Amino acid sequence: MERHTCRPDVSPLKQMIMKRVKHLLLASCLLPTFLGAQGVASASFLEITPDAQSAGMAGTGLAITDNGSTAIFHNASTIAFSQDVMGASYSYADINKDFGMHSASLFYRIGREGKHGFSVGFRHYKDADFHWQDGAEDHARAWNVEAAYFRNVAKNLSLSLTLRYLQAKAYKDADSKGSVSVDLGASYHRSMGILDEMASWTIGFQAANLGSKLDGQKLPARLGLGGAIDLPFSMDNRV
């Protein structure tokens, strides 16, 4: 006894509709990834910790007073309590084989007591490479330059203002998109009556990335509050 299975005929119109639906679903899956990559290149690179010291401490830097050369990326007001008169740094964050960021910065404390001064910084971010239909290779990129002024407004209190200009390009021949933002910082620093009064504690506050959109995307604005205790047991050992 033979068994026959009836299969309904699929008209050309239904086949075309099904194909369009598949393409639409594929595009909807790829679109968030594409937009996410654009977001990193245009604005979110500001959230990447550029220096090894802060990255090794889970990205903290709001209340650290001995990282003056990179403090402009975290909280420039802490430079007022640095033991150094001036400093400079350069670092390269090799995020993976496709992403990378160069950063450089310096600071200088003015006057005999160094109660005020300035700092400048630069960051350049390169996104992953992609290929056009003709095989040409390209990638998105973004960079920023910033300058900060810090000052002791009281014996243990310092404030800072950072002005930043950002620019991004989705690809080589795309129009450059620019934006301006500011950071506000504050630090309160006091010595402790232990370890020959060399120990200290600090509280830091920062309102960062307050400004206009970059390439149609909002900047990753944030508010941060942190604290740190410095316990120098010797010249070579500290917590």
Region roles according to the model:
Residues 26-33:
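Bacterial N-terminal signal peptides
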Residues 38-239:
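Subset of outer-membrane beta-barrel
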Residues 6-17:
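Short, Lys/Arg-enriched N-terminal segments with co-localized hydrophobic residues
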Residues 4-7, 30:
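Secreted/luminal cysteine- and crosslink-motif detector
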Residues 16-25:
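Bacterial N-terminal signal peptides that target proteins for export
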